[in-house]
Amino acid sequence: VGGFDFFGKTMLVTGGSTGIGNAAARGFLRAGARVIVTGTRADAADYAGEDGNLDGLEYHRLDQGDAAAVAAFDPDIERLDALIVAGAKVAYRRQEFEIATFADVLATNLTGPMQLATKFRSALAGQGSIVFVGSVASFRGVIGQPAYSASKGGLLTLTKSLAQAFGGDGIRVNLVAPGLVRSKMTAVTWQDPDRLAATERQVPLRRIGEPDDIAGAILFLASPLAAYITGTSLIIDGGLSA
C-alpha cells in the first residue's frame, strides 16, 4: 500500500497485530506515521510466526470487548489523527446461538468500537478520522452467525450515527465492508480447497481478498483525499455483492 503521506501523524489501530489491521498499520508506518496497535496477547513477541509484522509498531495489549480494559487503556496520545477499529470476533459451530457467546461477540464487535470512539473523541477533534472494519455481513445475515451478523449490521448504523454526532468536532467516521479476506479468522474457509474454490467462483474477480486490498481503502478514508467523506460504507468484496 503506497502513495500516501502520513508523516507526523499518529494512528491507533485496534486489532493491528494480524490480518487487515496489521496490513493497515504497516501501510501507515510506511507512509511516515507513528502507529500504535493493539492485540489480545501479553507481548508483541507472542505473535512471532503469525501472519502479521509488528516491527516498528508500538504494541499494547487490549481486549476491546472488555469494557474495563478499554476504560483503563492509556497509550501516550495527546492528538490522534486516525482511529482504525479492526479488532473483531466470530464463533463457529453454532456457538453464536448461545446467549453468552452472542453477548461476547457483540461486546467485541459493537460495544467496544463505540467505547473506543467516545474515549478518543477529544484526541481526534479537529482533524481525526475513524474507520470501522465492518463486513459484507453488515448488509445481510450470515447463516450460523447471528452474533457476527448483528454486530456488523449494528456497526454500519453506528457509523452513520457517529458521523452525525462527531461531524461538528471535525471528525469523520466511515466503515469498510470486506468480503472474504485471507486471515486467521477466515481460515476455516480458505484453508479448505473445496470451500475456497466454491467461494472464488462466486467472486467476479475470481479470488478472495488479501489484507492489503482492505488496507488501501482504510488509508484512503483516513487521508485528506477523503476529507468530504463521512457516514459512508465502502464494500470491498471483488464484486461479490454486485
Regions found by a protein language model. Name each.
Residues 135:
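Residue(s) in the substrate-gating loop at a strand-loop-helix junction
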Residues 117, 151, 159:
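Active-site helix of classical SDR
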Residues 156, 173, 177-188:
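Short, flexible catalytic-loop segment of classical short-chain dehydrogenase/reductase
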Residues 167, 172, 229-231:
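Short, small/polar-rich loop/turn modules that mediate ligand/substrate recognition or access, typified
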Residues 17-18:
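Conserved glycine-rich cofactor-binding loop
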Residues 91-106, 199:
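Substrate-binding pocket helix/loop in short-chain dehydrogenase/reductase
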Residues 207-236, 241:
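C-terminal substrate-recognition "lid" of short-chain dehydrogenase/reductases
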